[in-house]
């Protein structure tokens, strides 16, 4: 916990200063590309420095999804969207899984291993495509991500459970969205396929860790 509370503010300050410095010497397309790389690098370093193996896996899968988004941008084709289901399958086989869903009156329905893999693969595979669709309206995806990570963080803090991975991912998500807000929440600029896919896996993976899948689904 101490590492998280030290590294995240330090990373936010460093990212802010680097953006201010590079903005003066770069053209806008170069500057936006630099900020995208800086965002991914900040997530990777945060996971390596202060995250657990689960957090590192989620960030790694998000980076992989962003590469698919880059290919999707370079060679547009509807078939790229089906590749995110492959990302979801990899996530389901090697990462955290959706083991149950909450029901009314505090009851839970637990999945069999096979159903758990299918549910997780669909959950993680759909979110990158969903955010890309939301990103067709400039600023929409960024604002909904901010709402989602805020609710994820609140749900984690007040759940009464020990959920360090969910807390770490939610805090990083909110902090990095804030410091790169002009890239995500700009009302006349889209995030793009790569960044949308990156955040889609992050928010889907974070919601799998805690008690907040229903919150994430309802928000988005």
Regions found by a protein language model. Give the residues of each.
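Transmembrane alpha-helix interface/packing and boundary motifs in multi-pass membrane proteins
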Residues: 71-72, 127-135, 180-189
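Short acidic, Gly/Ser-rich segments with clustered Asp/Glu that frequently serve as metal-coordination loops
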Residues: 74-76, 126-148, 197
